[in-house]
């Protein structure tokens, strides 16, 4: 039987697509601020620090949601955790669109951040647990495709709302319409998530083998449901032993856990350190500074999302064919080149006005698009795939929560720090907005060397054999547990 004949591809993609709606709301919720931040700045009278806080406060909620995700998904199950995220998204969208004070705006955006953090951890966790190993990269790639689709959708909606609108209307009502538009996908997610099955791995952890087998029989064909159930149960034996010995949460001397956690956290941090979310949050601000035209800047931002969507589709196709490590390395170098190109034309924008400024703005956009293309087919997809699959079952919930939290801590720092750098008088006079792009390009180079040194190839490795594969990059274990052996056993 061919690998494809072993499982029901359509069913796996269907339930993963439902889970990926959490990713769509993730992208929608985080990117909606890009078009609204100008009017919000005027409405609440914010300075550069206030703008940074308005944008980055969501990341604080994301950190809380990511840290809580392991406990919530472990106790309630992956399905109920996704439903909780959907409800929090809905509350945030309604509340942030109706507020009258900046304090309450922050509160409701923080609630949305908790939803994003929860969905960002649980959605890929669910997908990796219901997907056969040969489909895992493609299935989890749907998560990033959904994130980017949500971003493209809100970039387009923001542009259509702002097109032809007066500045006074945008300041008074426009930003509320932008934020409130999220209610529609929120309600859709609340509805459809109730129809997906619970993760078979979680059911096994709860002792509900019958429910796990029922789901596995819808995913796999022939004798494979029983075989996969046995693999899951075998992989949990060590964890059960540690529970009996009261070592479940004591990772202080667990070198394997800390090495894998180090790799997972660094992959998550480096994904953010490329500066991708500066493109998501502040592209209209950067482009408006360079062109002097807000409507043109919002229109250009749509193309950043479109290119990311195309790149994400390419990455989802290549991830299980080329492998994680080659794509991450190529993407890191290509992203650095795009950022250097962007920084060059930002530097050249000083003193330009009118049509010349708009023309130079399109050169800046070209650099952003080059960066986004390379980032999208590599780190946009690859970081999520790697973080969702490198943690073995015994440390899965805790490890993923730690890595996703690290991602959002770095997101917060960058989101808060960029407006301060971008408005800094000294940096503007000497670099005209190019300085942050140089920093991000340097981080891309660092990402290349980190992946080369610390990340083994995980393509085709089962979750049950992942720990041996990851430890093959350590000096002690590499000789004892070769990565080829781990793959051969898969």
Which ranges hold each PLM region?
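TPR/TPR-like alpha-solenoid helical repeat scaffolds
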Residues: 227-239
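Short intracellular "coupling" helices and adjacent cytoplasmic loop segments at the cytosolic face
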Residues: 218-228
């Amino acid at each position: 039987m061919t690998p494809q004949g072993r499982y029901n591809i359509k069913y796996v993609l269907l339930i993963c697509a439902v889970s990926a709606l959490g990713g769509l709301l993730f992208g929608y919720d985080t990117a909606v601020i890009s078009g609204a931040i100008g009017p919000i700045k005027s409405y609440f009278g914010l300075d550069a620090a206030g703008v940074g806080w308005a944008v980055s406060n969501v990341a604080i909620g994301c950190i809380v949601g990511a840290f809580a995700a392991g406990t919530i998904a472990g106790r309630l199950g992956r399905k109920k955790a996704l439903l909780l995220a959907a409800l929090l998204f809905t509350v945030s969208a309604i509340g942030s669109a109706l507020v009258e004070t900046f304090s309450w705006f922050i509160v409701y955006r923080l609630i949305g951040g908790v939803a994003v953090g929860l969905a960002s951890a649980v959605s890929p966790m669910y997908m990796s647990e219901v997907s056969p190993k040969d489909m895992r990269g493609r299935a989890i790639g749907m998560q990033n495709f959904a994130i980017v689709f949500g971003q493209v959708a809100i970039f387009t909606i923001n542009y259509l709302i702002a097109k032809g609108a007066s500045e006074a209307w945008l300041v008074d009502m426009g930003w509320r319409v932008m934020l409130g538009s999220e209610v529609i996908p929120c309600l859709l997610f609340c509805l459809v998530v109730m129809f997906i099955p619970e993760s078979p791995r979680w059911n096994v952890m709860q002792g509900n083998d019958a429910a796990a087998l029922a789901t596995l029989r819808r995913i796999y064909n022939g004798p494979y449901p029983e075989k996969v159930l046995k693999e899951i149960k075998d992989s949990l034996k060590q964890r059960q032993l540690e529970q009996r010995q009261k070592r479940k949460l004591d990772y202080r001397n667990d070198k394997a856990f800390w090495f894998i956690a180090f790799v997972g956290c660094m992959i998550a941090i480096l994904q953010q350190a490329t500066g991708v979310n500066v493109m998501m949050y502040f592209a209209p601000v950067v482009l408006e500074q360079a062109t002097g035209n807000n409507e043109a800047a919002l229109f250009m931002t749509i193309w950043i999302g479109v290119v990311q969507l195309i790149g994400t589709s390419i990455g989802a196709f290549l991830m299980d064919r080329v492998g994680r490590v080659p794509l991450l390395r190529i993407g890191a170098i290509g992203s650095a080149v795009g950022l250097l190109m962007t920084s060059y034309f930002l530097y050249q924008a000083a003193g330009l006005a009118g049509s010349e400024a708009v023309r130079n703005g399109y050169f800046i956009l070209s650099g952003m698009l080059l960066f986004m293309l390379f980032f999208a087919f590599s780190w946009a997809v690859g970081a999520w795939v790697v973080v969702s699959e490198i943690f073995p079952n015994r440390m899965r919930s805790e490890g993923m929560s730690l890595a996703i939290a690290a991602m959002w801590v770095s997101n917060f720092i960058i989101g808060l720090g960029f407006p301060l750098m971008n408005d800094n008088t000294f940096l503007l006079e000497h670099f005209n907005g190019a300085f942050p792009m140089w920093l991000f390009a340097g981080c891309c180079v660092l990402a290349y060397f980190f992946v080369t040194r610390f990340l083994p190839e995980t393509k085709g490795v089962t979750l049950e054999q992942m720990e041996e594969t990851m430890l093959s990059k350590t000096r002690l274990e590499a000789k004892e547990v070769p990565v080829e052996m781990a793959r051969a056993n898969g």
